[in-house]
Amino acid sequence: MSFRNTSKSSLATIDRLELVMPKYAIRGGEATLKCDHSVPLEQLHKVEWKKSGMKIFQYVKGRTPPFRYFPLAGAELNKEHSSEKQIQLSKLDFPASGSYSCIVSMETPIFSKESESHELTVIEPQDTDPVITFNKDTYEIGEILEANCTTSPARPPPHVTWLINNER
């Protein structure tokens, strides 16, 4: 006599796994990264977060404490807003830019799946409008105009396009 286990849990897989996060975040600000998956909490074993292949956060069900935090250059993990479903990065700086992913592992059956990686770019927008200065106050028709456009520091650097009478 043979027995076959055809229970639903033995056939379970991770049908849905998606990393939801912003593409850009402002330097000094924060970013919330969500690991949206279809694993019921009772079957969830572990969720890991990686930046550029390096582990930065881990949740393991049943471990005390369930969360572990790993060094992350250019950001702090906000412990109050991080869980098995999301992490929040705060005090962002340029080294936090990079590729992020989450890995979800089930208890029964033992199965893991990694999300697609997504890029986060920490930016610093201009804090003032560009300023145009001219070498002279007035110009005669046909005279060569010399001007300078100065922008405030920004990352990525601003792209400057000159228009004269709304034409390039």
Which ranges hold each PLM region?
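Flexible inter-domain hinge/linker segments at boundaries of tandem extracellular adhesion modules
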Residues: 2-19, 50-55, 68-69, 106, ...
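Short beta-strand segments of immunoglobulin-like
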Residues: 19-26, 38, 133-139, 151-152
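Structural beta-strand segments of beta-rich domains
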Residues: 29-33, 143-147
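Ligand-binding face of N-terminal immunoglobulin V-set domains in extracellular IgSF glycoproteins
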Residues: 30, 34-36, 74-119
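Conserved beta-strand elements of beta-rich interaction domains across eukaryotes
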Residues: 37-38, 54, 94, 107, ...
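N-terminal V-set
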Residues: 40-73, 155-168
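Short, surface-exposed binding/anchoring microloops in extracellular/periplasmic proteins
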Residues: 139, 144-146, 153-155
